[in-house]
């Protein structure tokens, strides 16, 4: 004889297998509806290159934009967003900063790929996928990718910033987009005779 609990589990498994509530098809629908709503509310740009896969462009202020990939799997929604390429220098300091930031993040964590490029990556169980949770997750990605961008550039690319600044000045080109790094580009002050 089948118990009520066993019957409920069987029905839930059957519903998921058919793509019902809590399954991948339902999650795809929820993600798509959430992105459509965000596009209407705030002009968020997104596309779905294939079923269950979404690419969202998050606008930034420090970093022009962050491309975020959302992929619905059998059991979870994964999120990945490129933040910055492999640092040119101070790799240990960059990695330490990333690990310390991970302690404060919601739903995602900084990760490094085999080339050393920095990403934000996370997974969410399909049962937790909904408009509010997706908004919270994308908000975290945007806040971190954009908010940490200048810090990561300072830590991992200070020499490149100085070279770029000097090159632009020597050619009379604008240095406006390097204004956030003036503390790195201004000449060292001479203390003068003692």
Language model segments and positions:
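Extended Gly/Ser/Thr-rich low-complexity repeat segments
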Residues: 69-74, 133-142
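Conserved short hydrophobic interaction patches
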Residues: 34, 38, 97, 101-105, ...
């Amino acid at each position: 004889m089948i118990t009520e609990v066993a019957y409920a589990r069987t029905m839930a498994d059957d519903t998921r297998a058919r793509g019902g509530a809590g399954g991948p098809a339902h999650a795809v629908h929820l993600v798509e509806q959430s992105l459509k709503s965000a596009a209407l509310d705030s002009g968020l740009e997104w596309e779905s290159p294939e079923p269950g896969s979404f690419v969202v462009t998050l606008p930034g202020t420090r970093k022009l934009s962050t491309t975020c990939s959302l992929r619905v799997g059998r059991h979870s929604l994964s999120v990945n967003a490129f933040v910055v390429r492999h640092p040119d220098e101070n790799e240990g300091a960059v990695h330490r900063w990333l690990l310390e930031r991970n302690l404060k993040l919601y739903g995602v964590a900084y990760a490094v790929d085999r080339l050393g490029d920095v990403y934000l990556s996370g997974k969410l169980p399909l049962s937790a996928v909904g408009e509010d949770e997706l908004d919270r997750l994308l908000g975290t990605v945007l806040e971190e990718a954009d908010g940490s961008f200048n810090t990561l550039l300072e830590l991992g690319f200070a020499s490149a910033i100085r070279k770029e600044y000097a090159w632009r000045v020597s050619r009379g080109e604008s240095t406006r987009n390097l204004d956030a790094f003036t503390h790195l580009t201004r000449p060292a002050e001479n203390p003068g005779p003692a």
